[in-house]
Amino acid sequence: MSKERVKVQGYVLLDVDVVALNNAGKDTMSNFDNAVKTKSIYKNGNNYVYVSGQAWRFWWREALQKNIGWTLSPVIRDKNIAFTNADPLTYPDDDIFGYMRAATEEYEEKGKKKSRNITVTRVSPLKNSVLVSVASVRPVSNWSSMARQDGDSVPYARQEYSAIMKGMFSLDVDMVGTFSDYNRSGYKNISETLREKAINEGASEIADPFGTGKLVRLPLAIRQKRIADTLLALKNISGGAMQTNNMGDVTPKFIVLASMNTGNHPFSHISTSRGDRDEQAILNINGLREVLDEYKENFIGKVFIGRRSGFFDNYDKELKELAEKYNDLIEYLPINAAIDKYTEQLKSQI
């Protein structure tokens, strides 16, 4: 009996103070010539600060390089475009984060060397949202000055904020280490040369469950390691703008990790806000309970919930009661322990 197709569904909450994690350029509303605003967006008349999905992915990629030891695919610049090496066999980040590259491939025909243009595309198995404040936030504009030189000081301003921020991600386990080489736009993940190299190095061919062709799949141990590394990197992820003077901790302070047999992400509303201006972030325990009940047929294995002591301590009792009620479905642990135990469960599901 074949295993179910597994999608990792993750939900995180960050807790940051006096930061400016992702800026949006010059603040045209400021009285200062040198003023920078932070990224924010309006919903229902309220302002919410956010970090772009691209920035979060950049931090994630760097964590995999610096803390896990991945060798990242080199970035190649050609006039007004940039692309990675597009070699998911050698570089695990090309596999996990995807790529698109227009390339030329040499081949022999009747003893003569010829070249042909190919474009390889890899849709990322790892999808993620932006990181956005759970509650409405009004950034504060603070000014500083460069005053070490002779003469007048040079003032500049920046926006800062404190917020609880939420983010979602999804990792398609079956896609990791699995590549198609169909000669169709968007479906050619690897060149014929890389396909042959993969087979020679131990990759296998498997039937495409959604097509009539064959897919190339890397050995299980390689796929397991890439998937585990991607999740374990969350324990030490770091990044953000203005870190010299406004350093912030962007590791999760609350996390939910679940294996599911669908691509739907059900945890999007387990945190919400209240107050006259929606200024207070809260954990929606009823919403979490509702998700556990309504999607119980879609979960594969246990759902792991992690919380850092000192963050949302007032929900500890309710979360423990929830774990007792759903003891066959939930494990409630500290953050890193939850990530570690979920990763071990996931290895057996691949």
Which stretches of residues belong to each language-model region?
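RNA-binding basic/glycine-rich loop and surface signature characteristic of RAMP-family CRISPR effectors
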Residues: M1-I350
